[in-house]
Amino acid sequence: MDLPALSRPRVVMGLLFFPRGGSAQVTRALAQALVEQGWQVTIVCSSLRLPSRLGDARTFFGDLDVRPVDCTAALQAADPLCADPPLPPSYEDRPGAPDRVLATVDNATYEHLVATWARVLREACADQADLLHLHHLTPLNAAAARVAPEVPVVGHLHGTELLLLETIEQGPPAHWVYAGAWAQRMRRWAAACQRLVVPSATQLTRAQALLGIDPARCVQLPNGFDPRRFERRSVDRMALWHRLLVERPLGWGPGREPGSVRYPPHVLGLFAQGPVLLYVGRFSAVKRLDLLISAYNRAREAFAVSAPLVLLGGFPGEWEGEHPLETIQRTGARDVFLAGWHDHDELPEIFAASDVVVLPSVREQFGLMLVEGMACGLPALAVKASGPGEIVTDGQTGWLVPPDDERALAAALVAVVNDAPERHRRGTAAAAAVHTHYSWPMLGARLACAYEALLGRPPVT
């Protein structure tokens, strides 16, 4: 029997950023799983209202109790971070982007961010919650300390905060004037959390070194997948790729709108001849898309059959370093396709129309798209480092190569394409492995147990 709302424990989840990347997917999935575990969940989150509906928190979180902070007007402000409400800053340094990197944000703007989110937390009655679950280390942590100092805080590291701290420790760029202040804040916020969720053993080790945290306060909880949606299925592959690349394209180039990169119908012949190699993710520097395109270009002549490489993702207008379209033009790579940013709900069908999920990232914090692709029966090709090195078993569920090794990556691509029986064998093993360890219902139950242990309460029944 369902418990009445008043008797169910309540957690307020906070996400400073508007929904676009992996941490938003994790927030939504955990919130849904916690509701199934008998918890009331309220989400506070930045939001954008754009024609594309990308970044819209209400659309993204669906039926969940979400309190969006509409930052749309801030995009037109002289300084978007000083608007009311402000656009959240970023962990990434993308020149010209409206959401500039945290380490360039001065103290006055920081105070404005904290005051804004303190107001948001008050309106969400955070001080009456049983727990606060704050994703990343951001001004939300400072706001929570002001509004709900007696409420236990569970922090959640997603990895981008660790990348920022590593850059600061190695010597930040000259324009990161406030890097030291932000590093101190992040360490202070981490120390104030009663528990810290980390998705992998690698991240736990890095978090200890960068934040000085006690591992006894950490909960290792990987990211997962929804077994009700991510599974093997049959799709009309040619129809799907026709829709994504020809009929309704969303690929884009620097300074251009989604749909500006489109392909003629005749290219679809490539998709009928051999395996489809799929990358899913953002166009950030750590993903090493330039390396992937170069390695693919090197490997292509050794393929026994045509094997198109599809780059699915790249939040519109956001990229670091060389844009993939520029890399394609520079290298002369053929058979590489930009499919644009697609809703998470479309991924199961896209995985079903593909044969291998590829992630060349050298500092991938976890590798959510690997798990989701593997759940759909795709073997993975990734780098033997960080999260992917823990998810993929080389020789069993996929292929692992050394970081930043173009030759090794090219050789692995050739092996993937030319050995169909091995590809199928590893894909079957991949699906079995992730279904055992990474389903969201199972992970949500583990998180609920961690909550209840922190509060000293028996499990919700």
Predicted regions and their residues:
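A conserved catalytic-core segment of Leloir-type glycosyltransferases
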Residues: L6, T42-D127
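Membrane-proximal helix-turn-helix segments that form the acceptor-binding/catalytic region
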Residues: H175-L196
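Nucleotide-activated donor-binding/catalytic signature segment of Leloir-type glycosyltransferases, i.e.
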Residues: G313, G321-D345
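Short hydrophobic beta-strand element within catalytic cores of glycosyltransferases
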Residues: P379-A382
